[in-house]
Structures are given as C-alpha cells and as structure tokens.
Design a protein with these regions (language model features):
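Catalytic/RNA-binding core of pseudouridine synthases
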Residues: 1-5, 9-212
Length: 212
C-alpha cells in the first residue's frame, strides 16, 4: 500500500499529502480514475463499489495470453460464421449476474502471490470464478471481425475476461484492442482532468499535509 501511495505521488507530482486511488486501470486502458487526497482517502472503499462504464474494442478471431495487446497473439480462430445478429444475441447472455474467471495476468492473489507475477514467470495460474453483475451491455459498432461495445458493470469486472468469454460464446476467440473507462459512479470522463493538470489544481485546494 505504501509503495502504491509513493507511485501515485510521484506520478502526480505531490509529496506531502495523503493520496490513494479508488481502482486502477489496466496498463493499456485509459479513462476515469478517481484519485483521493487528504481526508477523502477515507472514502476510497465507498468509491470502489461504484458501478463503472467502459467502451471496449474487441478483435474477434484471435486470442492473447493477457486477453489484450500486452501479449502477442497465441491462437487464431475462424470468424466467417459470425454475424451482427449473432453478436447481439451473445452479448445479452452476459447481462445480469454472471460468474467470471479473472485473467491470469491480473492483480488477483494466488497463495499470497499476485497472479500476474506467477503468469509472467510461466507458472500455471488457476483462479476461482467471481460473481459479478453486468447491468448493461450493448453493441455500438460492428465492423467484423472488430466490434465495439459499451458495458456498465460492478466492481471486480475484468473487461479483458469478458472479451475472452464473448469470443468463446461466438465459437471463436477475442481479445481487447482498446478500452476506455468512461464513468465511475456519477463521475464521467468529461468531468475529469488530465494527470498533468493535477498539481496546478491541487495548489488551489485546502489540503492536509502529512509528516512522513
């Protein structure tokens, strides 16, 4: 936790205030990330349970070990049988309460160790399914073999794993090629500031300085 705080402080250019985040983004994802400072750090757990909205771009017909572009393609599958109607029907299968197995390349813990540390060493990682909720899922664009979807989901949802499962349900494969978190609770992308603008904004706030 302390290392995480130091990393955030360095990234934001702040040193002497309490700081934390209410949910990380995947390395290749962009979008809303709630940063809490000072007394607001006490609300981190509350923010973590807010529903999240994502816009995801999926490439059908190919998979990667990480389910995104972090790793290279490891297998290809046919896509000629896939139609827009088939995609729309499959997406609705994921609406509601579902069980999802997290990616091996994730921060989930296995016997006290991070899954991604084990996966990067080549160890086989077995993760248990987690119960989560997909409140909304819709097809935004369909340019086969690429599709773009919007997802509103609960805490703990891995959109990379959802891409994997959608690919399998389409009797093919899939991986993420783009991911934007567009909303956390009521905080939308258009309400946010760029990371580089944070120090200037912070100077205008009343903050509680901490002693290391």
């Amino acid at each position: 936790r302390r290392q995480r705080q130091m990393c955030i402080r360095d990234r934001l250019g702040v040193k002497k205030i309490k700081v934390g985040h209410a949910g990380t983004l995947d390395p290749l994802a962009t979008g809303v990330m709630i940063i809490c400072t000072g007394k607001a750090t006490k609300r981190i757990e509350e923010f973590q349970y807010y529903t999240k909205e994502y816009i995801a771009t999926l490439q059908l017909g190919a998979t990667t070990p990480s389910y995104d572009l972090e790793k290279e393609i490891d297998a290809t599958y046919p896509t000629e049988h896939i139609t827009r109607e088939m995609v729309e029907e499959v997406l609705q299968q994921f609406k509601g309460t579902i069980e999802q197995i997290p990616p091996a390349f994730s921060a989930c813990k296995v016997d006290g160790k991070r899954a991604y540390d084990l996966a990067r060493k080549g160890d086989e990682v077995e993760l248990k399914p987690k119960t989560l909720v997909i409140d909304e899922i819709e097809l935004l664009e369909c340019n086969l073999p690429e599709i773009k979807i919007r997802v509103v989901c609960s805490k703990g949802t891995y959109i990379r794993a959802l891409a994997r499962d959608i690919g399998e349900a389409l009797q093919s494969g899939a991986h993420l090629t783009g991911l934007i978190r567009t909303r956390v609770g009521e905080v939308r992308l258009e309400d946010c500031m760029q990371v580089e603008d944070f120090p200037e904004w912070l100077e205008q706030q009343e903050i509680e300085v901490i002693n290391e």
